[in-house]
Amino acid sequence: AKQVVEQYHLLENRYLNVESKKKFSVSMQHYSFAVKAFVQLAKEVGMDEYEFAVHETKTKEVIDNVKNLKSELGVLYLSDFNEKVLRKLFKECDIEFKELFTCNTYVYLWKKHPLAGKKVITLDDLQEYPCLTFEQGVNNSFYYAEEMMSTYEYKRVIKADDRATMLNLMVGLNGFTLCSGIISEDLNGDDYAAIPLKESEIMHIGYIK
């Protein structure tokens, strides 16, 4: 996540190097790499003069928090599937999206999962295991999903509100989720693996402001 940290530093120069600015908040989808970059930024800038806030939350709330100035920045992703809808919403909210990087889709699961030894996983391989997705509340449109392939008809789906619960479900039920593959072992631990999905789609991860 070196590139993410570098981007945070650029944002730090813009938002924090102003004497009258005493608060800095970031809202984000459930990305451990973004939390890690935020932690590094807070340590390097120092927490004596600034009040930091990080909100790991639902997609619509990320957008609303930036729109309503609760957060200076929001971290989320665009794909071929959701880009048209979300960019329309960004325009309505008078916010803009800046891409940080692109990545393929990975299957994230427990290292003792029956599929953990595979070099590549297919959607057919995953049919007998529960797909874990983040709950989006009343805005439960496929376009707000934090996971790729949100319209695919999985046999079993479990929704969760936070990363800790999702990690527990991976261990307890051999669940999986689809992600960017950029994982922070410092935060999630080293008991999990990210394996390429054969039917991968491109994720455009960036920030809104």
Predicted regions and their residues:
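Hydrophobic hinge/microswitch elements
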Residues: 67-72, 136-193
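N-terminal winged-helix
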Residues: 13-65
